[in-house]
């Protein structure tokens, strides 16, 4: 076993943790990752030799690879995701709670000798710009070269992070294994995993993560959802900041004035499409800072500032096309990994919605010849992993260690009725109620839940690392700190008519909604009118010029459906009852206000 990693680590706490893990998991070899391009290429070559990775046609996708996972390891596994806090009360009713001591014992049994026959990789990573007051350092120990390569794209990773950590910095311990030890001479499978014993566990007492049995994105790239949301939200609650499941964009109007917005949507509701929106309206510009996670802190001037802690995109491929998101296709043109997409005869990738006609002679995501009219060629949760700086609409402030000031926070979901196209909260408290009441039709990003309506407060249901009622209270507390808070808005691109057709054209036309939000943050009063559920655009207030949208359709999008809203309020109140006495009274008061005003 190579011991040269020891000489490169000056942090005694990190050194002793690594030694502890090695003793527990018994790897054949140990490797400290430096994050270099040479290391990345060597690991990609190793995976090609093992039949795990397929290089794409370099003329179509330079330095890109396709990976196929096991069909039993294709999405975030919420039923195996646990939050361990001293008391169950601290984790709250929306999290799977386990006693930390019991869970540690269970995991130690699973991890014992689990890396036999494999290489243990030490992956130092930084969430957030290097040397930013926002940033957190983690070290992931993993036995998956796919994870190492993905972490190079998704995080700032390697020697520079180790240097920043120094000999006494704080770091988050992240231990990951695919859970498939190899006996001497045993041949490995292309995608090792152990679905029966899958565990993704967060220990809030020492800010550590242990993940076993899955090699898939959110379960295995522990910097992403585990550190940047579940651990960071807990930390933010203690320290007075927010870790949110939000995109961050810069919107510039034709006069050249720019504002930054953050927006929360549940998985697969168009976050990446909005983050990379290509405006059709002349003179407008939308630039991307991130498409998934925002860390938000009060700045010295009293405004809220946001950074994207990530370094890459882990985007849903399905439906991404030159029409829906040309910037996403440009982003993953080179230096990207594709997981569970189809492979075309000429060495390109394909997924449903990429083109109207599927190419002939494809290999599907399970490695079989694809048959037209049969199963989908790509898995519905197929992904591209692409570098942030490859995005053609990347905002110049993307790496600013201080973050960017937010003027609007937007909440959205996939709702076919009741919820208007856009509306503005009457107050911060009303806005927090809007976030707490979010619900959406579910998608393939979550195992076993396709097509149901589920509550997803702030789009944080799977990612909040502590009691959600305390999280709502934390959001409310920002109104008492004398801050210059962003305005809060709700949007819904997904209303349908009586024929089941989407009313709003969506995609690049969503800029028209951003334009209204932009003007509202400028204090334009004439473009909105007050209703019980918030400020809605007046008929003339929303720019619909050049849109094929009838007056009836516009009315449907911008009218308060009193009966629908009464049902909505009652539904939210019923959901909030799961939090019992912990539920903040201010949110319940907002629900009562809406109800009484609707009468």
Swiss-Prot record:
Tell me if RNA-binding is a UniProt keyword of this record: no
The UniProt entry's coiled-coil ranges are none
> Which co-factors does it depend on?
Mn(2+)
Q: Which residues form the active site?
A: 269
Q: How and how many cofactors are bound, per the record note?
A: Binds 1 Mn(2+) ion per subunit.
Report the EC number(s), separated by commas if there are several.
4.1.1.32
The cross-references to InterPro entries, in alphabetical order and at most eight, read: PEP_carboxykin_GTP_CS (IPR018091), PEP_carboxykinase_C (IPR013035), PEP_carboxykinase_GTP (IPR008209), PEP_carboxykinase_GTP_C (IPR035077), PEP_carboxykinase_GTP_N (IPR035078), PEP_carboxykinase_N (IPR008210)
Name used for this protein in its record: Phosphoenolpyruvate carboxykinase [GTP]
Gene symbol of the encoding locus:
pckG
């Amino acid at each position: 076993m190579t011991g040269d990693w020891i000489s490169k680590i000056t942090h005694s706490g990190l050194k002793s943790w690594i030694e502890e893990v090695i003793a527990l998991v018994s790897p054949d070899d140990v490797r400290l990752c430096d994050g270099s391009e040479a290391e990345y290429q060597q690991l990609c070559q190793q995976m090609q030799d093992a039949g795990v990775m397929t290089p794409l046609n370099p003329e179509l996708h330079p330095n890109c690879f396709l990976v196929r996972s096991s069909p039993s390891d294709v999405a975030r596994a919420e039923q195996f995701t646990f939050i361990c806090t001293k008391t169950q009360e601290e984790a709250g009713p929306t999290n799977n709670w386990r006693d930390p001591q019991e869970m540690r014992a269970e995991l130690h049994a699973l991890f014992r000798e689990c890396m036999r026959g494999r290489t243990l990789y030490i992956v130092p990573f930084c969430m957030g710009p290097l040397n930013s007051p926002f940033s957190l350092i983690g070290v992931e120990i993993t036995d998956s070269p796919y994870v190492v390569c993905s972490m190079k794209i998704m995080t700032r990773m390697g020697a520079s992070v180790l240097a920043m950590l120094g000999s006494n910095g704080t770091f988050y311990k992240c231990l990951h294994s695919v859970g498939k030890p190899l006996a001497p001479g045993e041949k490995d499978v292309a995608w090792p995993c152990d679905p029966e014993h899958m565990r993704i566990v967060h220990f809030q007492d020492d800010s550590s993560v242990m993940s076993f049995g899955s090699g898939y994105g959110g379960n295995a790239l522990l910097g992403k959802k585990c550190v940047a949301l579940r651990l960071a939200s807990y930390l933010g609650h203690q320290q007075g900041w927010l870790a949110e499941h939000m995109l961050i964009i810069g919107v510039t109007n034709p006069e050249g004035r720019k504002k930054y917005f953050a927006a929360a949507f549940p998985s697969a509701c168009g976050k990446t499409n909005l983050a990379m929106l290509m405006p059709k309206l002349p003179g407008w510009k939308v630039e991307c800072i991130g498409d998934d996670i925002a860390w938000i802190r009060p700045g010295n001037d009293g405004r809220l500032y946001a950074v994207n802690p990530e370094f890459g995109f882990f985007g849903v491929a399905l439906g991404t096309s030159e029409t829906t998101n040309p910037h996403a296709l440009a982003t993953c043109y080179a230096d990207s990994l594709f997981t569970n997409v189809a492979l075309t005869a000429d060495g390109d990738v394909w997924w449903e919605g990429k083109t109207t006609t599927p190419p002939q002679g494809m290999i599907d995501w399970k490695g079989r010849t694809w048959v037209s009219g049969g199963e989908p060629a790509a898995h519905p949760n197929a992904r591209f992993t692409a570098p942030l700086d490859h995005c053609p609409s990347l905002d110049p402030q993307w790496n600013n260690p201080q973050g960017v000031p937010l003027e609007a926070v937007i909440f959205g979901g996939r709702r076919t009725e009741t919820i208007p196209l856009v509306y503005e909260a009457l107050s911060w408290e009303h806005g927090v109620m809007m976030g707490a009441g979010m619900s959406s039709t579910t998608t393939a990003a979550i195992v076993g839940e396709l097509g149901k309506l589920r509550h997803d407060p702030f789009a944080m249901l799977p990612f909040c690392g502590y009691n959600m009622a305390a999280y709502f209270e934390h959001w409310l507390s920002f109104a008492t700190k004398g801050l210059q808070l962003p305005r809060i808005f709700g949007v819904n691109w997904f209303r349908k008519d009586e024929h089941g057709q989407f009313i709003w054209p969506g995609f690049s036309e969503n800029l028209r909604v951003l334009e209204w939000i932009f003007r509202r943050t400028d204090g334009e009063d004439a473009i909105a009118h007050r209703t019980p559920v918030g400020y809605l655009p007046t008929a003339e207030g929303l720019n619909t010029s050049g849109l094929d949208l009838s007056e009836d359709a516009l009315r449907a999008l911008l009218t308060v459906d009193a009966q629908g809203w009464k049902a909505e309020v009652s539904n939210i109140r019923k959901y909030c009852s799961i939090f019992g006495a912990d539920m903040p009274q201010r949110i319940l008061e907002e629900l009562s206000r809406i109800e009484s005003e609707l009468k």
